[in-house]
């Protein structure tokens, strides 16, 4: 991001947004730094505005997938070493290790949300289930050197969770209807997102995360084993 922006310019971008379900894809969600007039973090300006306009999230449309959310052909194998698909490969590695400590058993990876080709929806990187607390986790995985803002990660996985037909999802995974569904970013310990949360002033981002019921988890990798810390 070469140029700086005033607070009103950032708010104007938000007010001109046509589709809240694609907000997480907007370039300005990843702006790092401070407004040139009020010296507020760009992410804080955005988070505060979203808190004040929280009802906009109700406009995210649920997509009911006619095919199963659980993809039977997901066998834990991949043939593509393309670095652009590193997060997908990592998700498969986590699937193959079967569990993710406090997040429970890993049920699937790259879980599709689209029903039709033109649907504006991505894929859930990892689905896990902790049977002790009857909670299924929808996890948005980011590779270690990813430099997206935590705000972007939060908005992405929250949008996916709102898009999901939760009743059908639970049925497809043979989970009881009273299973709690929790959406979370899954980022590396000491990553940009982790440092952003522990080192900076993120009052409004944290308030937004509380309202969205989004909690990030931090992951490490040792000897090809992934663990939550």
Regions found by a protein language model. Give the residues of each.
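Charged, terminal alpha-helix-loop-beta segments
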Residues: 1-229
């Amino acid at each position: 991001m070469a140029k700086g922006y005033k607070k009103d310019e950032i708010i104007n971008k938000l007010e001109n947004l046509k589709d809240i379900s694609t907000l997480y894809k907007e370039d300005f969600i990843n702006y790092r730094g401070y407004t040139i007039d009020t010296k507020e973090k760009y992410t804080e300006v955005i988070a505060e505005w979203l808190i004040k306009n929280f009802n906009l999230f109700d406009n995210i449309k649920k997509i009911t997938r006619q095919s199963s959310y659980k993809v039977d052909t997901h066998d834990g194998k991949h043939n593509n070493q393309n670095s652009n698909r590193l997060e997908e490969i990592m998700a498969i590695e986590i699937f193959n290790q079967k569990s993710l400590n406090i997040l429970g058993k890993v049920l699937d990876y790259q879980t599709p949300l689209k029903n039709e080709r033109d649907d504006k929806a991505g894929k859930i990187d990892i689905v896990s289930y902790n049977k002790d607390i009857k909670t299924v986790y929808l996890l948005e995985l980011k590779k270690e050197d990813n430099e997206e803002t935590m705000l972007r990660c939060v908005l992405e996985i929250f949008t996916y969770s709102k898009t999901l037909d939760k009743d059908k999802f639970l049925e497809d995974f043979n989970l009881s209807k009273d299973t709690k569904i929790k959406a979370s970013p899954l980022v590396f310990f000491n990553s940009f997102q982790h440092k952003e949360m522990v080192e900076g002033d993120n009052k409004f981002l944290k308030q937004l995360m509380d309202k969205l019921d989004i909690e990030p988890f931090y992951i490490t990798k040792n000897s090809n084993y992934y663990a939550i810390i």
